[in-house]
Amino acid sequence: MQGLVILDKNDEVIRPAILWNDGRTVKETNYLNEVIGKERLSECTANIAFAGFTAPKILWLKENEPDNFAKIDKIMLPKDYLAYRLSGCFCTDYSDASGTLLLNVKNRCWSKEMMKICDVREEQLPALFESYEVVGGIKTELAEEFGFTINVKIVAGADDNAAAAVGTGTVGEGGCNISLGTSGTIFISSKDFRVDENNALHSFDHADGGYHLMGCMLSAASCNKWWMEEILKTEEFDKEQENITKLGENQIFYLPYLMGERSPHNDPDARAMFIGMSMDTGREEMTQAVLEGIAFGLRDSLEVVRSLNIPIRRTKICGGGAKSQLWKKIIANVMNLKVDVIESEEGPGYGGAMLAAVGCGEYENVQAAAEKMIKVVDTIDPDMELVAKYEEKYQKFRQIYPAVKGLF
């Protein structure tokens, strides 16, 4: 998940992992985008640099911790470190490798040019597998320690968002999944490789063997958690939402950029704000504005998808925020999409289990697993009157970030 784990020649961890949401690499990200150039990056990897990607972290390490950089024998992503300890296999999967900015996404191989730019050797990078492929078996001593048989297989696994997409059945051509987790994503599965003109969306390999486009918000449910727990000092999320009934009429706006933003702005300096309060504004209006602001932020990425003439009419939804019936209704009307709720609430974990089932031969492929294991239990239809109200509000929302960008 784009975090950086580095081991020395003795397989000892050199330093604490630098996580996906670490913002220290602004300088390195700017160097990649401005000096190396976005066009060149896109040609090599199908993406431009974002502060959370792994390559900027490697450059930061080289500049700021040269002694640690010199010790690197293996470069890993967090989940792959666990697989390495369990099986001894130094590997990763294509979906997770896509976020390193070291992978040629279209051709599913490490980019020699990006390795040169980051001063990385191919032997320092893990072997590449499809997410559903078996990479090895559990070590005998660990099988004994955990009480497992030695026949336990280790499957490559996937990036959290790709796993969530599999776990909601978002595979094949034209599937859509919205994840309302700590971060928020809108994920479009595809059989064909695609890149948007401005690289506003991530263009990654998918865990089903195909490709996907993804818009990523750094703060989604975490915005709601911050508002509820830090500002309102409550953990009763449902109670705070139960009196919100006048959808589409609230004129308070919230920019959901607590930790900067990725898609589509790629601005680590962006910050959150409320706009439009008056003496009549209360906590219900502010709470509603937070939920709507996150939905509008995801809509920004959906607009990029629509600009590519990809027809999206419905979406799956997962993540902790998807437990809120109100939020799902807001999403349906802001996006003008049918929102399908699946039986399992554990998108990424369920998707990981599905990939393991394919790897162990229970299903022929990921599509077949999805057809058998995914069940839609509810659908929220958009209300065209609310769609019209939210369309008007969204057009105002999208003017705010450009207007205040210079203040950050």
Where are these regions (language model features)?
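Short, acidic/small-residue loops that bind anionic groups at enzyme active sites
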Residues: 15-29, 342-343
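Short beta-strand-loop/turn "lid" adjacent to the catalytic site in phosphate-handling enzymes
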Residues: 1-20, 48-52, 83-104, 127-130, ...
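A conserved helix-loop-beta module that forms one wall/lid of the active-site cleft
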Residues: 118-130
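Active-site core segments that coordinate phosphate-bearing ligands/cofactors
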Residues: 26, 33-91, 101-112, 116-119, ...
